[in-house]
Amino acid sequence: MQELKRAREIIDDVSKETDSILLFHSLSGKDSIVLLDLCYKKFKRVVVVFMYIVKDLEHIMRYYNYAKTKYPNIEFVQVPHYALFYDIKTGYMGIKQDPKQRQWTLADITEKLRKRLGVEWACYGFKQSDSLNRRLMLRSYTDGKEAINWKTKKFYPLSTYKNKEIMDYILDHRLKNPEANGTNKQSSGVDVEDIEYQKFLLLQ
């Protein structure tokens, strides 16, 4: 598979610079499932970062338990999802509002974790096929693979993957399938439309 070869080359390039990474993971989404499997084999220290909106949802914990068994040397940290800060600030869907709530971005969270954990490089599962914004961002990189930002020390091994290729990798390597919700849509990990999240908001 051409895309698998490309992803491994991207990871190899970064592994020559560092043996430790932050890996932002949705805990059950298909892209994250593939990303962890690829990176675990190449880095001595893999810190899996899960950004939660609601802690300890059942489908999230199923994948967490699976991953800790399959990849025993991973470290795991949970931090609030940046969307949660916006929800609190605006009182979205009835959540208790705090107009003074500071807003955080993914970049802010990454920098905070870098300082806290002493890990410089960060890995994300973004793909060009996800959206126009991601396609434009990834194609702006000059690494030759449209996947590594050497200046910011961020990399995206799945940059040129398509969803079918992601699922083929999961099947070929016999990894845990991504969760499916009641509408048969595959899980992307944390989804603000998830029924458990909506129930959580109503209780606040």
Model features per residue range: what roles?
Residues 1-204:
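Nucleotide-activated chemistry modules centered on ATP-dependent adenylation/adenylyltransferase
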